[in-house]
Amino acid sequence: MSFEVFEKLEAKVQQAIDTITLLQMEIEELKEQNNTLSQDVQAAAGSRESLVRENEQLKEEQVVWQERLRALLGKMEEV
């Protein structure tokens, strides 16, 4: 009877070891996913900064063109 108890205990220990091993593998996969996502976030932040700078530049160019257009319209009204 004690041998049966020992076998049951051994099976439970083995099951616990298997579960721990699977969880460790899952943790490693999640760490890799986390690293990939972190890199994606950094890349997106860099792209965002670039787009913000480009947007500001385009706004400045728009203001310049609007001023030129107003000047031309003013000259046309004078004629």
UniProtKB/Swiss-Prot annotation:
GO cellular component annotations of the record: cytoplasm
Localisation: Cytoplasm
Sorted UniProt keywords: Cell cycle, Cell division, Coiled coil, Cytoplasm, Septation
GO biological process, alphabetically ordered: division septum assembly; FtsZ-dependent cytokinesis
Coiled coil: 4-78
Stored NCBIfam families: PRK15422.1
Protein function: Non-essential, abundant cell division factor that is required for proper Z-ring formation. It is recruited early to the divisome by direct interaction with FtsZ, stimulating Z-ring assembly and thereby promoting cell division earlier in the cell cycle. Its recruitment to the Z-ring requires functional FtsA or ZipA.
Assembly description: Homodimer. The ends of the coiled-coil dimer bind to each other, forming polymers. Interacts with FtsZ.
Family: Belongs to the ZapB family.
Protein name (record): Cell division protein ZapB
Gene name linked to the record: zapB
